[in-house]
């Protein structure tokens, strides 16, 4: 709790711009789009959670690609130095430059890379069930729709122009393709060696690149281990 004397001290206050999104008062669509505009933050939180609990090399590589993509966006913005639309009506933004949109570039990188992963990386077996294929198609469409809606939200909320989100999407898509190829051709062959490092073993870092369907593999292994332990427990109780 602040002391009484501290309340009168002059100070320059700054917001945390990472999660600060403004929308027109009373605009329901703008309110919803403002929350949707926070999707990159939700994605990052999801990645950190996955890495903490799964510790899988490909997930770490994916997050590294997103970080590199953000670095490229920052570099392009500071080289082009194109201002945001309408004279910058928002006071709390990370940078005054808007070309290209970092939100658009982030979401299109995430969506395009996930799309390639679903159809090229996971499509290693020819006996995929109908529901698996349907889930893959629905998820891909959902990812692409999310990328478009986030891009649209940045224009609607006057953070960017259409050209800024368009070029951001193009940059993110190209970066996703390049990083996917780099991961598949350069990093993936190194994953078994990296997973065998002492530091990787200490932190339980694992490589699942040779397993076509990790979800099904984890389900079957967990079920088999649970049944095995249940049988052993039943034997001890007899």
UniProtKB/Swiss-Prot annotation:
Cellular component terms per the entry's GO annotation: endoplasmic reticulum membrane
Name where it mostly resides. endoplasmic reticulum
Recorded catalytic reaction(s): these are: a di-trans,poly-cis-dolichyl diphosphate + H2O = a di-trans,poly-cis-dolichyl phosphate + phosphate + H(+)
Q: Does the keyword Hydrolase apply?
A: yes
Among CDD domains, the record links this protein to:
PAP2_dolichyldiphosphatase
The transmembrane segments are 33-53, 100-120, 130-150, 162-182
Q: Where in the cell is it found?
A: Endoplasmic reticulum membrane
Keyword terms, alphabetized: Endoplasmic reticulum, Hydrolase, Membrane, Transmembrane, Transmembrane helix
In which pathway is this protein known to take part? Protein modification; protein glycosylation
Here the disulfide bonds are none
E.C. no: 3.6.1.43
User: In Gene Ontology terms, what is a biological process of this protein?
Assistant: lipid biosynthetic process
Q: Keyword Acyltransferase on this protein?
A: no
Q: Fetch the Pfam families from UniProt.
A: PAP2 (PF01569)
Q: Which GO terms describe its molecular function?
A: dolichyldiphosphatase activity
What is the top-level taxon of the source organism?
Answer: Eukaryota
Supply the InterPro entries for this chain.
Dolichyldiphosphatase_PAP2, P_Acid_Pase_2/haloperoxi_sf, P_Acid_Pase_2/haloperoxidase
Give membrane topology per the record.
Multi-pass membrane protein
Q: What class of enzyme is it?
A: hydrolase
The family annotation for this protein states: Belongs to the dolichyldiphosphatase family.
* Function summary: Required for efficient N-glycosylation. Necessary for maintaining optimal levels of dolichol-linked oligosaccharides. Hydrolyzes dolichyl pyrophosphate at a very high rate and dolichyl monophosphate at a much lower rate. Does not act on phosphatidate.
Tell me the PANTHER family matching this sequence. DOLICHYLDIPHOSPHATASE 1 (PTHR11247:SF1), PALMITOYL-PROTEIN THIOESTERASE/DOLICHYLDIPHOSPHATASE 1 (PTHR11247)
Protein name, as recorded: Dolichyldiphosphatase 1
Source organism per entry reads Callithrix jacchus (White-tufted-ear marmoset)
The taxonomy runs: Eukaryota, Metazoa, Chordata, Craniata, Vertebrata
